[in-house]
Structures are given as C-alpha cells and as structure tokens.
Amino acid sequence: TPTDTWKLCAVVLEFALAVLCGAIVHSYTGSRLRAFLTYAILAIYPTVVANGSLWNINCIYYVILFFLGLYLYSRGNALLGTGSILAGLLIAVFRVRSWWMTLDVAYPVSLNRGWPNFYEIIGKNAFVELYDKVSLLILAGMILTGIYWFADKKVKVTKDIVLRLFLFAAILVPYFAPYMPAWAGYTADVAALIYFMRWPKRFYLPMLHLIVSYSAYAYAINGETKLPMVVFSVLLLAMLTNVGVDLYHAAVKGE
C-alpha cells in the first residue's frame, strides 16, 4: 500500500506499543530481560508489521489505548485505565463499522469476514439473518454473566486478574461477534505475548494465536490457507477455554 501520513504515524505508534508492552511486562514481572524481549519481539511481530507497515489497516490507533489502559491498571490507576480502554473501544467500533459500510454487499451473506470465529464451526452461511440479530446479545449476555459472577463471589480484582481478563476478552469478543475482519486478533496477539511473559508455562498461547492471525491474513489476501478455517476456529476455542479456566482458578483462589 502507498506510504502516507496515517501509515507513517502508525509505524511510529507500533514502536511505541512495543515500548509500552515492555513497560507492562516489567510492571508485572520486575524483569528487565523479559521487558526487553517483549519490546524486541513486538518490533518484528509479523501480524503487527503486516497490519500497519504493509497493509495500512492501522489498528494501532485504538489498540495502543487498550494497552495504555492495561498499563495504568497495573500501576494502580483504575479510573484512567478504564477511560483509556473505553476510548479505544469507541474508536474500534467506529473503524470496524466504517469498514463494513465500504463493503459492496447489499446484505451480509456470511457471518465471517476473514477472522475464524465461532460461526466457522456452526456454519457461517447458515441462518445469517437470525445470528446477525442475536449474536451481539449473546455476547453481551456472556460478559454480563461474568460481571455478575465476579460481583457475587466478591472476587478481588488484582493485577494478575486484570491481565487474565484482558486476554480472555481480547479472544472472546472477536470470536463470538459476527463479521469480524482478518485483523480482529491483533489485540489478542499482543496480549498473549504479555501473558506468556507473566506465566512462561503458557508459552504456546502467543505461538498458536499468531498462527491463527497469520492464516487469517493469508486467507484475506489469497483466498485460501494450508488448513481449513474451521481448524483455526477450533484452535481459538481451545485457547479461549484455556485462558478462561486460568481466570476461573485465579478468581477462586483470589490470586
């Protein structure tokens, strides 16, 4: 894609995101080595580079606000952290809606626009009009149920709980929301790396999620992948379950 001002600013922000995520890792682990490794990896992360530097999609404009919010949470500033994340969500919704409006489709014929979401498993071309209307309500119901459970159990929201919630939400939302584009996993790509730096036993999460994202990009560009997209959808479901179980155990134990 042509290099313009938006693209150049996005590239600068991508490096800023790498520095910010390094600071987040240092805040969580106290390890300068892990913080530097996080920066070094994100500076060459394939899907991050492809999103801005090559493809000019520039999700970084709202994604960096998500991670700024996470950093503020890790430093004990919940109010500013929440505000930063909400600002990122508003920009993300606007960007995705604008992208939908540019598509030359009179009415959606598929619940998938590149990201291997849940509808790959149940049939992305079946009952489109039905799922189109209720899928967001189902997603909202899941989120509200989680909030109610946390409130009912009086779970103490620690730094680690916030990080687990962050990654869980980053995988959950694009997985159950319809019409998600190929770059819908951008936030979870980065969050999974931070998750691994905090809990090294989960080293496979960033690796697997990066494979899914890269395959989604390949499918969007070439119209095909080495494996059926449903395989990546099942893989995402397994990762979502893994992080969800981690979150549940941490909440029960109060970690």
Question: Whereabouts are the PLM-identified features?
Answer:
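Loop-to-helix entry region of an early transmembrane alpha helix in multi-pass inner-membrane enzymes
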Residues: 2-19, 36, 52-53, 128-138
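Membrane-embedded helix bundles of polyisoprenyl
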Residues: 11, 22, 34-73, 82-88, ...
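Aromatic/glycine/proline-enriched transmembrane-helix motif characteristic
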Residues: 104-176, 245, 251
